[in-house]
Structures are given as C-alpha cells and as structure tokens.
Amino acid sequence: MHILVVGVNYRTVPVEIREKLTFQETELKRAMTTLQSQKSVLENVIVSTCNRTEIYAVVDQLHTGRYYIKKFLADWFQLEIEEISPYLSIFEQDGAIEHLFRVTCGLDSMVVGETQILGQIRNSFLTAQEVKTTGTIFNELLKQVITLAKRAHSETTIGESAMSVSYAAVELGKKIFGDLTDCHVLILGAGKMGELALQNLYGSGVQKVTVMNRTFTKAETMAEKYMGHAKPLSELQCALLEADILISSTGSSNYVITKEMMKKVERMRSGRPLFMVDIAVPRDIDPEINELEGSFLYDIDDLQDVVEANRAERLKEAEKIQFMIEEEIVLFKNWLNTLGVVPLISALREKALGIQSETMRSLERKIPTLSDREKKVISKHTKSIINQLLKDPILVAKELAAEEKATEKLALFAKIFDLEVQEEVEHTEELEHKRAWTPSVSSL
C-alpha cells in the first residue's frame, strides 16, 4: 500500500489552467466513485477548491497508481494525459502525508493560516465516507489530520492575522478606492466566498450592497442579513450599470459576465470605471474584459500581493504548527506499521484458541461427568492463561513491526510459533517500503 497525492494548486499552476481541472461540488460523489473503480486505487478523497484540485489516494503500486489517476483526470476533463502532466504536482508516501497535514492546517494556503480549507477538507472526507471510497488508512489519517488542524488553530495565533481570499478582495478594493463607504458593491454569488466578502465589506462601512444569485431566495437571505438588496440574475446588466465594485464567486462552469456584455455596459456607464474581482474557479468573468478601457479585472491569482500582509508574523506561528505536524506524522506512521502485524497476531490468537478448544474437548472425553458450569469455569480459566501467555509475544510483535528489517524479524517470529503467515509476510513487505519514503516538499 502506498499513499499518493496528484493535483494542481495555485503555487505552480495559473488559474486559467486550474479552472480546467476543477470539480463542481455536485460532481464529487460520482467522481470519487469513478476513481475508486480505477486499477490500483484502493481509497480516494478528492479536494477541489478555488486554489487547488488534489486527489488523495491509497494505491497498491505507485507507478500504476500515478498513471491511472492521471488517466482519470484526463478522461474526466476530456483532455490528454500529455496536456495535464506538466502541471501536476505529485507527492508520495511521507511527502503525501505531510502535504495533507500542511494543506488542512492552512500552511499551504495562499493565505497562510486561513481556516476555510479545514472545512473544505472535512466536507470532502465526509463525502468520500458517504460513497465508501475511504477505508482503514484514510479513515484514520483524515481523523488525525482534522483533529490536529483544529488543535493547531486553537493553540497558536496563526489564524488571528490571516486573511481569507474574500478579505483580500475587499482590501484590494480599499487600495483602489480608499474609503468604501460611498461605493456601490455588487456581490455575484451567495455561497461561502460571497458571504465572507460581504462580511468584510459590512465591517468596512459599505452601505450600498446588491446581492445576486442563481437562486434568488439565497440572495434575499444573504442580503437581509447584511442590510443589502437582492436582485434576480436576470437583472445583471442593470446591476453592472450601478456598481462601482463587483466581487464574483459563483459555481458556474461558464462565464457569467462576457466581454460583449461589458461592452454594452461600458457604453452606458459614461466613462465611470468598474473594479471587478473574480475569486471563482472556474472564473466567472471573461479575462478579455481587461482589454476594455473602463473595466479593471483582477482574478484570484492577482490577490497574492495583498495576502502578503502580516506574512512574517504568520510564518512564526507556522513553524510551531510544522513541528506539531512532524510529531503527528510519527504517530501515524507507527500506527500504519502495526497494520502489517495485525494478521500475524490474529493467526497467533487463532492457533492458541484452537489448542484451548482441543484441550477442552479432550477433557470432556476423559471426564464425561463434568457439569456445564464446570466446563465454563475451566474454559474461562484456560483462556485467561492463554491471554496472559500471549500478552508479551504480541507486544514484541508490534515492536518488531516498527523496526528496520521488519519482514525478516516477523518471519522469524512466525517460524517460532509455527504460524501460516505467507499472506501476512507479503503485506508486511509492502509496509517496509514506507521506510524509504520520498522526502516531502516543505515550502511555505
């Protein structure tokens, strides 16, 4: 068994590529189920956000697993493997485990220390559990990862100075307009990102806010919460005429605002500039709009400079969390190593209980006058003797599984007790590869 991560993220892949490899939330169940049927894939969780699309998988062979995950991505998005391969980041074994911890703790985010990714990882994990694409390995790993991420944010101050992407969008607006009090802001999309932007706008003193969404009732609910106004999406062109700032984050797979639409709007705006921030992936706004004279469009990758604020302070806290991650990885690997010894221990117990059962049958033949109560007492005490005798050997077996050359040592252990463990030894040989895991990528 091997743990593998394959995907794209904001660090190395621009938004125009990432948006081609983004799963819609409604697709995740079907996507994970489809991936689970691929050769070599034993478990999988897919995480797809505005900054990353990553597949976390347990595979039986690294090379085969890598190929079939790439093939799945290419087939799903109707691309060629050769087209996507140059953009894919791949983490294996130790590197994959550390990457998952770092991502969930917010250390790999554009905004170091942000907490939104924790909820996104958790939701993906719950979805994977629902469609039964996780098993023993990921159920334990994700439980540890999510628990540590919560602890990291409660025991450090990394989240106190961290901005969300939505906050960064508002800060960019402040840099351009200064005081936002008199600005008319249009929020396109009533999801989590849109609401976070609205929260930050409300805190900045914005008084004129219009919310638009595909589902009008959602726009109404969010607008009422922040003393704004809701409009149906059919009135988008009219809303663009009134707005000074647009922040867009819908779940649309196509452009919501096209260049042709903005050409018409600009002619009616009488030279008034429109500042637009597109924080959606895939993008909501046609990037060619930047060619128009009165439209100033920024996408999620343009927010990098804004989120650098307080970065030095957050990196100090990130070092503390990195240390916590390294400790947790050791604990997880120790647990992982014990998996190879579980069948061996089961075989030992089974053999011992078989001897106990045969002994009981022999006693019953030799002493036919034993009452049921006497049989139960004898059985109970002989099992107790077995448990006490097995306690130390089982402890030793677990310790051997975590040591170097575990395969040979456990094979000797099996030979001493005359156990049939061919399958278990092969399983342990797989686990031994974990002691030569590739180093991780640890950049902040």
Curated annotation (Swiss-Prot):
Disulfide bridge positions per record: none
CDD domains: NAD_bind_Glutamyl_tRNA_reduct
UniProt cross-references to InterPro entries, sorted A to Z: 4pyrrol_synth_GluRdtase, 4pyrrol_synth_GluRdtase_dimer, 4pyrrol_synth_GluRdtase_N, GluRdtase_CS, GluRdtase_dimer_dom_sf, GluRdtase_N_sf, NAD(P)-bd_dom_sf, Shikm_DH/Glu-tRNA_Rdtase
Molecular function per GO: glutamyl-tRNA reductase activity; NADP binding
Coiled coil (residue ranges): none
GO BP terms, alphabetized: protoporphyrinogen IX biosynthetic process
Pathway this chain belongs to: Porphyrin-containing compound metabolism; protoporphyrin-IX biosynthesis; 5-aminolevulinate from L-glutamyl-tRNA(Glu): step 1/2
Main EC class the enzyme belongs to: oxidoreductase
Known catalytic reactions: (S)-4-amino-5-oxopentanoate + tRNA(Glu) + NADP(+) = L-glutamyl-tRNA(Glu) + NADPH + H(+)
Keywords per UniProt: NADP, Oxidoreductase, Porphyrin biosynthesis
Site (Important for activity) location in chain: 99
Misc: During catalysis, the active site Cys acts as a nucleophile attacking the alpha-carbonyl group of tRNA-bound glutamate with the formation of a thioester intermediate between enzyme and glutamate, and the concomitant release of tRNA(Glu). The thioester intermediate is finally reduced by direct hydride transfer from NADPH, to form the product GSA.
HAMAP family per record: Glu_tRNA_reductase
Database matches in NCBIfam families: hemA (TIGR01035), PRK00045.1-3 (NF000744)
Assigned protein family: Belongs to the glutamyl-tRNA reductase family.
Name by which UniProt lists this protein: Glutamyl-tRNA reductase
Organism: Bacillus cytotoxicus (strain DSM 22905 / CIP 110041 / 391-98 / NVH 391-98)
